Amino acid sequence: MKPLFVTATDTDIGKTYVCAGLAYALKKMDIDVGIMKPFACGAKQKIGFSSNDLTILANAAMVDDAEDIINPFFFPIPASPYTAAKNLGVKIDVKHVMECFRKLDEIHDIVLVEGIGGIMTPILKDYAIIDLIKDLMANTIIVTSSKIGTVNHTVLTLSLIHI
């Protein structure tokens, strides 16, 4: 099955819960679901899974894949991956993310990938979430909210993703 990438119009909008709900529903249909959150930022401490999001996703999908594969990049500061990596002196390797994804794709029927922030959240200076979605050749689910201004954010996101 083609991977599903769950993105959003903003941060803290519900990507994890949508992704977990999908993982749980697919698992109930006897589909072997892999999960991946290539970038996690903001958690102060790394115990077990790198972030609460990963714990929720792994529990919903009922998987115990290696943490360094499902979350290749973990940054303990609340920022975009690009900013966090720059501040911490870490080099982000997108090829490594793709290798981790391929490993998951080989052992699962489908891989659900949860993004970070919105589609224009920078990963590298000239590479954003939207570029990762294209490189993964994933179908995309956009999570949005009902707050004022969301229609604009949603239309802008859709126009960039060409749906």
Labelled PLM ranges:
Residues 15:
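Conserved lysine of the Walker
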Residues 20-89:
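N-terminal phosphate/diphosphate-binding loop that engages ATP/GTP or pyrophosphate donors
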Residues 161-163:
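Conserved small/polar residues in nucleotide/adenosyl-binding loops
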Residues 126-146:
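Inter-motif core of Ras-like GTPase G domains
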